[in-house]
Amino acid sequence: MKRYRYGLFFLTVILGAFALYRCFAERRPDHKEPESVRIGITLYRDADTFINSICRILETEAKKYEKTEGIRMILDVMDAKEDQNTQNSQVDRFLALGCDVICVNMVDRSAASVIIDKAMDREVPGIFFNREPVSEDLNRWEKLFYVGANPKE
């Protein structure tokens, strides 16, 4: 049951990332259906068993989605190794690679504003997962989302 909930949770993340991309891309006058969607995923620590399992589920669900929808899903996954500066650099790399969406498992939830500024500058939607950024940061832009459980529960 627990694995099913994890799978469902992260299927929501991957489909949410693609839906975000499509939603905002379709507003552009030069929009055409994508052949691929590139998603940058930065993890606070890949050695964490739970986070590692999340990553594997994301990769599996992306492959399933690719097969059913015919749109190539490119997942760039990086491990920040519990270092916020490393994670910030990874986001820079994702943006330089032209990622359509970034998904972030924050090292330091109070440092999300740096990543948000970078995403806003490039008009790239962001999904934060598992560790919720400070609400003031999430409310700064309509292209920012959090997927995860309420930590108080």
Regions found by a protein language model. Name each.
Residues D83-L97, S110-D117, E136-N139:
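Pocket-flanking alpha-helical
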Residues A25-I39:
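Ser/Thr/Pro/Gly-rich low-complexity linker/stalk segments immediately outside membranes or between
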